[in-house]
């Protein structure tokens, strides 16, 4: 990027750690065939925290570099719906909101995943999943020259592997 003839090269590193737990409100069969393990749906309430760390470097070529970092912890609550479509295939829809002025003023997350269970170390103890996720922050701290503002929405594909112990 060039502004007023000055070449600027930005670099942003973002680290995110989400930890939490869930409470299963219930699981319901989606099939009315007695004695059969058919499709089911489970609904969970979730709660936890989302830690965010950002490191920003602005290299003004020929002039110098500005850099800084910021980190904060957001409390989050949400809901998750898990559709067990077959013994191996599943669909998960989840979302959360948080911040509440503790870390961010507001943060949210929404995602959808398709999963496939398989045998890794035991019976159906692993799940390969892929889908799409969006994550947003509205974070502000400081004033004047010391003001830091992070109002960002990130979204894109997600791939992962989960292992159950």
Language-model segments: what does each one mean?
Residues 45-51, 81, 93-97, 112, ...:
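Transmembrane beta-barrel strands of outer-membrane/channel proteins
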Residues 90-105:
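Transmembrane beta-strand segments that form the barrel wall of outer-membrane beta-barrel proteins
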Residues 110-165:
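Predominantly the C-terminal beta-signal and adjacent terminal strand-loop region
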Residues 16, 25-27, 49-55, 97-101, ...:
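Transmembrane beta-strands of outer-membrane beta-barrel pores
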Residues 14-20, 42, 72-76, 105-111, ...:
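Transmembrane beta-barrel architecture of outer-membrane proteins
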Residues 1-16, 53-70, 100-103, 137-156:
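Extracellular/periplasm-exposed beta-strand and loop segments of Gram-negative cell-envelope proteins
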Residues 19-23, 47-49, 77-83, 112-116, ...:
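Residues on the lipid-exposed face of transmembrane beta-strands in outer-membrane beta-barrel proteins
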Residues 26-42, 85-89, 119-126:
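Short loop/turn motifs that connect adjacent beta-strands in outer-membrane beta-barrel proteins
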